[in-house]
């Protein structure tokens, strides 16, 4: 099952991996909606939500069975044990928020990988391998290569200053720009059109190209101009396209508004 890490295979083929964020809906049926829509990955958010590790595991395992690569964003400085539980629960990759330095990135890799690449503790049945009892050597080989992706979030001006060193860390797969936090930290919250913000993204792109890493984008959901520029010019190959809560909110507004427009009683009053 670990062979379908869409984050890695899409990037290797020069194609975009589209992720849907899950931060509100705990029911694993949300995975079927994501699959029907055409997403290839799940971004299960334990940083900005009240979802539990048990919720994350259920959603991740549903993703594994549906061909969607499950990623879990863990809370900042959550500790090795929390990351271990997320991986053992079915995550094929961990999203680490607020990575400022190369040392932060190296610590993230160490946490996710089995020895000799890291310090992750061994468990002999992995969801990414179908929960089959598997030879330990095989678990190490498969999980280190394809079922423990390391996604580090670039969310501060200090991260941009250290971007070349962060991108050079062996074992990091994706540098994911958190646009909301980054623009806020730069003193221009939500002003994605500014030259300074665009320059920061260009620096991430250059560092990724130089080190052979994948650039990702998160936090900008309805700006098609920026999406087009990021994908086709900056070579973004992983994108958090939307969150379940945003999709529900927008659909609810659209539905109520559409019905209100044809409500004759309302028009007469």
UniProtKB/Swiss-Prot annotation:
Cellular component, GO, one term: cytoplasm
Positions of the record's site feature: Increases basicity of active site His: 88
Site feature location: Transition state stabilizer: 73
Catalyzed chemical reaction(s): 4-hydroxy-4-methyl-2-oxoglutarate = 2 pyruvate
EC numbers for this chain: 4.1.3.17
Cofactor annotation remark: Binds 1 divalent metal cation per subunit.
Binding residue positions for substrate: 181
Iron-sulfur in keyword set: no
InterPro entries, A to Z: Aldolase/citrate-lyase_domain (IPR005000), HpcH-HpaI_aldolase (IPR050251), Pyrv/PenolPyrv_kinase-like_dom (IPR015813), Pyrv_kinase-like_dom_sf (IPR040442)
Class of enzymatic activity (EC top level): lyase
Keyword annotations of the record: Cobalt, Iron, Lyase, Magnesium, Manganese, Metal-binding, Zinc
Annotated catalytic residues: 48
Family: Belongs to the HpcH/HpaI aldolase family.
Subunit structure: Homohexamer; trimer of dimers.
Protein purpose: 4-hydroxy-4-methyl-2-oxoglutarate aldolase; part of the gene cluster that mediates the biosynthesis of the tetramic acid Sch210972, a potential anti-HIV fungal natural product that contains a decalin core. The PKS module of cghG together with the enoylreductase cghC catalyze the formation of the polyketide unit which is then conjugated to 4-hydroxyl-4-methyl glutamate (HMG) by the condensation domain of the cghG NRPS module.
Name by which UniProt lists this protein: 4-hydroxy-4-methyl-2-oxoglutarate aldolase cghB
Species of origin: Chaetomium globosum (strain ATCC 6205 / CBS 148.51 / DSM 1962 / NBRC 6347 / NRRL 1970) (Soil fungus)
């Amino acid at each position: 099952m670990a062979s379908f890490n869409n984050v890695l295979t899409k990037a290797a083929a020069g194609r975009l991996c589209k992720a849907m964020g899950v931060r509100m809906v705990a029911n694993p049926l949300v995975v079927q909606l994501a699959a029907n829509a055409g997403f290839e990955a799940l971004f299960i958010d334990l940083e900005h939500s009240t979802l539990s590790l048990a919720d994350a595991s259920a959603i991740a395992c549903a993703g594994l069975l549906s061909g969607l690569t499950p990623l879990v964003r863990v809370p900042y400085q959550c500790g090795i044990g929390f990351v271990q539980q997320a991986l053992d629960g079915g995550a094929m990759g961990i999203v680490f928020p607020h990575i400022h330095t190369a040392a932060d990135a190296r610590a993230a890799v160490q946490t996710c990988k089995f020895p000799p690449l890291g310090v992750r503790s061994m468990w002999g049945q992995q969801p990414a391998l179908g929960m089959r009892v598997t030879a330990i050597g095989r678990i190490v080989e498969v999980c280190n290569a394809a079922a423990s992706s390391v996604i580090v979030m670039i969310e501060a001006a200090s991260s941009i200053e250290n971007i070349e060193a962060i991108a050079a860390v062996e074992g990091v797969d994706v540098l994911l720009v958190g646009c909301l936090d980054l623009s806020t930290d730069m003193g221009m919250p939500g002003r994605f059109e500014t030259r300074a913000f665009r320059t920061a993204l260009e620096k991430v792109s250059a560092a990724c190209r130089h080190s052979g890493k994948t650039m990702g984008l998160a936090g900008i959901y309805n700006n098609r101009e920026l999406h087009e520029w990021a994908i086709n010019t900056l070579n973004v190959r992983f994108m958090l396209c939307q969150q379940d809560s945003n999709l529900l909110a927008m659909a609810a507004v659209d539905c109520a508004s559409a019905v209100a427009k044809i409500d004759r009683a309302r028009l007469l009053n």
